[in-house]
Amino acid sequence: CLLSRGLGDVYKRQGYDMIGIDQSEEMLCVVRDKAEQLGLSGRLLLLRQDLLKLDLYGTIRAAVSTFDTFNHIPDLDTAIANAGFFMEKGGVFLFDMNTPYKHQKVLGDNAFTFEEEDASCVWRNHYNAADRKVEITVDIDYHETGEHFHEEFCEYTYDLATIRAALEKHGFALESVCDGETFGPLTEESQRYFFCATKQYTQLEE
């Protein structure tokens, strides 16, 4: 999220105007509250949109995407094309993604249980090799209220060559890719990519 405490304070000092995008109205409300706490409301536009149908009404100079957003999108090529369409020449695109290693070897067909004082969580995974995606089921029980939360979603697996090709196809130069947890060089067991790409030309003329 662009408005995590550290990033929000940095953007506030630098005077950036920001656009926050999510399909969830609930998440946008959380960001709106955070923006008010940081005094950023006047420089923040929140849009409820699908990244596959993006319309920003103008150009941008940078984009930041975290928490594996692009793994949740079945059409990576279109999502990157949309980001590129609205970005000015020289614009910076920063984003992270889970690696094939994490999907296949760490999540795989494994289940994880987490116990906290106020809640317990069971996270189940199934790797669908034919469709190259992880099918994930999350169940959370809140001890005090007895409330139960259930969610099912997929993460799609994209290898480095596919991501690089999509970036280059849509006008980006891949400046660097590193381990998204250590920020050191990638290894065979890296679980997260972190990408820095720059746009080579402007497509949308205002």
What does each model-identified segment do?
Residues 77-92:
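A short glycine-rich, Lys/Arg-flanked "PGG" loop and its adjoining helix->strand segment in the class I
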Residues 52-63:
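A short acidic, Gly/Pro-enriched loop at the edge of an enzyme's catalytic core
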Residues 158-206:
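C-terminal lobe and adjacent flexible extensions of AdoMet/dcAdoMet transferase-like proteins
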Residues 94-166:
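SAM-dependent methyltransferase
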Residues 9-53:
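Class I SAM-dependent methyltransferase SAM/SAH-binding core
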Residues 1-8:
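Single conserved hydrophobic/aromatic residue that forms the stacking wall/gate
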Residues 60, 132-134, 188-193:
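A short, glycine/Asx- and small/polar-enriched loop/turn
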Residues 71-72:
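A short His-aromatic
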